[in-house]
Amino acid sequence: MPLEAQKVGVYACGPTVYDYAHIGNFRFNVWVDVMRRVLEWTGHEVKLVMNITDVDDKTIAGATRLKQSLGDYTARYTEAFFDDLCRLRIAPAEHYPRATEHIDEMVKLVERLKARDLAYEEDGSIYFRVERFPDYGKLSRLDPRHLRSTGRIEGDAYDKENIRDFALWKGAKEGEPSWDTRIGLGRPGWHLECSAMSMKYLGETFDIHVGGVDLMFPHHENEIAQSVGATGNPLAQFWLHCDHLIVNGTKMSKSLGNQYTLKQLLDEGHDPVAIRYLLASVHYRKQLNFTYEGLGQANAAVARLRELVLRLEKCTEGLALEGPGEGKAALQRADQGFRETIADDLNTSGALGHMFSLVKATNAALDCGNLASGEATAILAWFHDVDRIWALLPREQQLVERTIEINGAVLEAVGIPISDDNFELVTARMQARADRDFVAADKLRDRLVKRGISLEDTAKGVRWHVDVSGRSG
């Protein structure tokens, strides 16, 4: 139960804007978006806060390397992140607090910790005393007596009383940005940022805290220690962690050349909505194995759904008023199964399975003439209703049924929405065929096939379809 009836406060650990986000990052963002949409679909009002880490070791190193100000350096990647969220149809959070804009809140939190003797100063930096917080390690089920400094903590390389202690405030260093505050000249530690900003926008205790599974330790343990240490109250009622995305069964990394950005995939001609579908199709607590074959299958799945919705929209008036009831029964089964599975720890894969069972049953009923007009209307309304969660269906302005004039003839180009550059290839091929330049037309067709788009020439023009094969080669 939420702390306040029908209202849910959610804090999500957002990007560190030192580089362009990759599809592993967006697996998390799509999951958060689906979770938020499910909560809203079930009648809750959601307040989502996602931080932007725009000051840390990586952002400082990047800005220094390019001889840019920290603000200029991080602004480029922050803007790109928001652009990618839009392309993936991710609804915006209510707040995107930037770390550099909340220094005062962080200073106040450190002062509260010092007042409780949970923080100490050493050589200009301020650290949290882990040994004075007995619940440290409970979230990740680790014994604090056996913990070692790892990852981003070890990289801080600052002096401290105990190897397990972590930096709250880092003393100023030459060439690094710093703030002159009541607790000294320096900059915030990574963990401090999230504690201060989550409590500012959601209160000392809120409903749900989410992040990647790699953040459970040490980041979320440190957040809990700071926040609970300062307030004496739980930070969040529930902690949810999204598992990793891997590529072709292998960990994603720049060194292996398999760390894909959204822009890379879009430049290859892939539909961002199909990418969204793929990222949402596996339960969040399981690894998602990204492959181009899987992306092709996601393209095909989205196409099947969109084509059925378009079919239902066009055929409703021509259907019989009554039928054998196949459509009604299929809808009831799908709706019940969908609701049960999506409510079971956000089981997206199971819920999608129920949705596509209805796609299959509806197409079969239409093919046999066994779907009544009332059933078709109800099924169409159901698909639009659950799409409040998935955001897969074409928006009103994105329905692609265009007429093109070539050599004085008006031709039609009709199909599932595709990217503008792919549509330009479709148009160029239509022009080549009209000019009887069949060699050029065949080459353009081959380019589209490699992008997972097949063409069907008709007397009126051309139709396109998304293939299961996705990317070839």
Name each region found by the language model.
Residues 61-65, 136-137, 223-224, 471:
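Short low-complexity, flexible loop/linker segments enriched in glycine and/or proline
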Residues 52-57, 78-81, 91-106, 124-133:
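Short, glycine/charge-rich beta-strand/loop segments that flank catalytic centers
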Residues 258-473:
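Structural preference for alpha-helix termini/caps and helix-kink/transition segments
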Residues 1-18, 29-34, 83, 104-314:
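Alpha-helical recognition segments enriched in aromatics with Gly/Pro capping
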Residues 1-89, 464:
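N-terminal, positively charged nucleic-acid-binding surface of large information/translation enzymes
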Residues 63-70, 94-100, 212-213:
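The substrate-binding groove and active-site-proximal loops of carbohydrate-active enzymes
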Residues 45-47, 117-123, 454-456:
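Short, well-structured beta-strand/strand-turn elements
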